[in-house]
Amino acid sequence: FEALSRGAERAWFWDRSAACITTIRDNARHLNAGDRVIAQRIDATKPPTAPRPVDLVFLDPPYEQGFIPTTLDALTRHGWVRDLTLVVAETKRREQLVLNTDWISLDRRDIGDTGLSFLRPSMAGAA
């Protein structure tokens, strides 16, 4: 929602939980952003084909289950990522994020018990 408040054209929200999707849709209506929000009950490791690549991806999967590399690969394969896409991946503070050579880590910030990794596709892996 922050991205929408700062001028993003559209935001996709995916979650495996129906309750979370309902909450997202309710919040979108409350913020008068319903026409710019697409909230879908989807496993992010199995995304649909993108209508076009996006500029920003925020990943907040369950911690310490290895979902981030799998999700990054899936998003790339399905056209969500391009060479300038910025990915912010949330992990547990002490969780080590292991990426393949298709991704470069730009920065990492620790906030409390949370780690935020800022990633971009490498030129070799860019779609």
Task: Report each predicted region and the residues it spans.
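Class I S-adenosyl-L-methionine-dependent methyltransferase catalytic core
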Residues: F1-A127
